[in-house]
Amino acid sequence: MTGHVDPVHFERLKIQSVTFGSANDNASLQVHNVSKSPEYSKYSYSRKNNEPIEFIQLREEEGPIVKVEEEDGLTLRFQLEFHAQEGKRDVTNLTCVYGTSPQQLDRLITREFSSDANFQNNHQVFLIGNIEFHSNENSKKIEWTWSNQSLHTLYFRNGGSPIYLCFAEYDKRLNCLVPLKTFQFYVTESDQDSTPATPFPMPMHLAEETATSPEISDAPPLSGNVDPLPINSPPLTNPVARDIDQTEPEDGPLFRATILNYERTTHDMRMVLKKLIKRIEHVAHSHGLLYMSYKELMSAFERVATINPPAFKPFLDHYYAAAAQSFDSFNIDRARLLRNFLIEPLRKIYDTDIKNVSTKKKDFEETSRDYYTSLSRYLSKSEKETSSDKTKESKFAAKKRDFELSRFDYYSYMQDINGGRKGQEVLSVLTSFAANDYNLIHSSLTDIDALRPSIIQLQDIVTEANKEFQLLRAEREERRRYIETSSRELEDKDAEIAAQAYKAKVDQDTSAKQGLLLAFSKSTSDLQVVGKSGWHKYWVVLDHGKICEYANWKQSLELHTEPIDLLMATVRPAQSVSRKFCFEVITPQTKRTYQATSKAEMHSWIEAIQYSISESIVQKGKGTSMNSEETSVKHGPTSTIGKALQRVASVTSPSRHNSDSKEKKQTKSPSLVKTLKEMHSSDQSCADCNTTARVEWCAINFPVVLCIDCSGIHRSLGTHITKIRSLTLDKFNPETVDLLYATGNSFVNEIYEGGITDWKIKNFENQERRVQFVKDKYLYKRFIKSSFSHDPNTGLLESIEHSNLKEAVLCLALGADVNYQRAVVKALLKNNYLIAELLTLNGASLNVDEVTMETLSARAQAFVMNRATP
């Protein structure tokens, strides 16, 4: 195998051997010069244990070069032999210069050496020193080691890069570096995972010389075809700057043709660069539009999530809210990046250089025309010189100088645009954009990748929900088949059994029942006269010894008539009515006939009313007031269906009873504030700032009692964080009142302020400190200190199972999902109305299907109906 002949000073320096080593002084590759001819070198390569050696050919004219692996501590130990020349014995300032291409090496040795006064400080230059010969010496050998310290900044393209090492001496007379010898090899990355390439096949005549090690010669290449490069080899060359001839040709056909070609290329460059800038502006504008589109999409998701939280809110919380923020940042930053790093730099190059080509061309042509006109005049003069001719000759010389300068400037300008300095400026702009664009994309992908655990968690939640809904679907199908196969006769036979079952049920609960009944619009109507159209549907509620009828129950509850007091009433099946399933309620003031939807329902209503009548008599005997509003406030958790529905009716539909409701509210609210402060001493002061002034507000979803200043801060956080109510002006559900009774400020602060060590933090110097404290306490929850070891969702279910209200508040503070496994339904099934109310106030969904509704108690059904009614 042969290589390239070095025709310059080949006899001055000869590389006798090169040893590739590592940090532990292990020789990985040995290279020996086996040529005995002084005209060229022939190298033999060998490894320990006769391991194969890889070669790669980058350029056909260079021949194959050896491949080595880049590693920390890679060294090349050279054995160099210098020969004295006649008239030039010593070697002055022997220098080793390395590069990644012959062009780069040539530029370093010639142009950069001439222009850089600190050339010796270049990281690619190594000064070895002077080599001095004694008087009787004609040759001298030295050893010098080159290390790979500078390779840490080397750019490896496709896993490797060529290295060219050139030994040169300094010529004082010419003030330049004179190359003596060049050695090249190919470095691959140490972590490159690729199949080793087959050693480059050697020519036959070299294989005959040595059968154990391949040899590469610097002699001219022999005839014969060269095999293609090994698979996975890097490209032939790395991108390098275009070599430009700095000497312009004389003005003539060649110069004009070159200029004409440059002008055409520049014109095309002007057109395509202008279109490119417009396309980039369009892309930047598109990123702005995309930013607005994502904003609108996020707003749409948020609106629909407020309407249907179970379907959309988990998607927003676990993925899209954070992802949309990342998308917004990416689009804004990408638009800014395109504008600052592409559009503005390219437009500056276009406006200051490429756009002015016609002006520069016009100036050059005018100067050229003026010069050749002056030349014609100058040549038309006779050879006899006069004083005036000398003046004209000096003017002509000035014209010629101006023309040559103009020609030089125009030619240099055209060279800069066509692959020269301006082309390098464009490449620099694109490279800067590429680096920043990569960093931006990488950062955005990192942000998106961080959402992967949340997405996996969301998938697990959906999987569990799907399993639960499959069970619910099976229950619904079973219920539907039961409804299809059941008959009216069967229901009539089982009516008595159903009535007895309900009687046992009401013995355990309060005397409460609600349902759909038919009745006349007026209790005084004659049943024998009024036809079918006289019967109307009413939602009837039996609660605490009273029967309330509500009309228009499909849209909103409206109290139809005055409640019927059952203290002196009696109930019985209606005998004088031709319609079935009728019963009548008789009091000293009125007689009211109702029709149930089945015989079982009729018996159920009769049993419930009879039980309520007996209970009213007992309570009357004890002297206990049956006013439902007073019972709710004074005795805590005794609220039931009637008050709940009556409260909703008074709020949602104006009627003649509104004035009574207002009066009750005005008499009740002050007593609520007083009762809370009497029950809990901590409620006498604000839960956040400890002031005792105007403590008349509360955050019902935590729940805590607040002053007017702190309540304003709470209100600014939004209703999704805290729900503020006035203890003196607003009206509360009985369960909310019970929840306030059962907790108190100290109860809640043990959880939300358990981590405060320095209580000076609550001494607010200004409003900003107060606002920050409220946000830290309720929004960021930075003061919670808990040794709770369970998952908050699991802990929430356990608190419901054991009726542990404090643990439920703690789990919600730790981020438990209020809709986890239908926690509200589980609380209602346990008759735990305090935790159910706590969950509802914190946003729990009350979408209870019909099958589940039937399993709830009457009070639990009222709880759901009260909050599900629009």
UniProtKB/Swiss-Prot annotation:
Q: Where do the segments described as Disordered lie?
A: 212-251, 647-672
Q: Give the C4-type zinc finger regions.
A: 686-710
> Is the Transport keyword given for this protein?
no
Q: Which UniProt keywords apply?
A: GTPase activation, Metal-binding, Phosphoprotein, Zinc, Zinc-finger
Can you give the residue ranges of the Arf-GAP domain? Answer: 670-791
Q: Which CDD domains is this protein grouped with?
A: ArfGap, BAR_ArfGAP_fungi
**Where in the sequence is Phosphoserine found?**
S625, S653, S655
Positions in coiled-coil regions: none
A single cellular component GO annotation:
cytosol
The protein's GO terms of the molecular function aspect are: GTPase activator activity; phospholipid binding; zinc ion binding
Q: Which InterPro entries match?
A: ACAP1/2/3-like, AH/BAR_dom_sf, ARFGAP/RecO, ArfGAP_dom, ArfGAP_dom_sf, BAR_dom, PH-like_dom_sf, PH_domain
Location of the PH domain: 510-614
Q: Name one GO biological process term.
A: vesicle-mediated transport
What Pfam families does this protein's entry cite? Answer: ArfGap, BAR_3, PH
According to UniProt, the name of this protein is Protein csx2
User: Which source organism does the UniProt entry give?
Assistant: Schizosaccharomyces pombe (strain 972 / ATCC 24843)
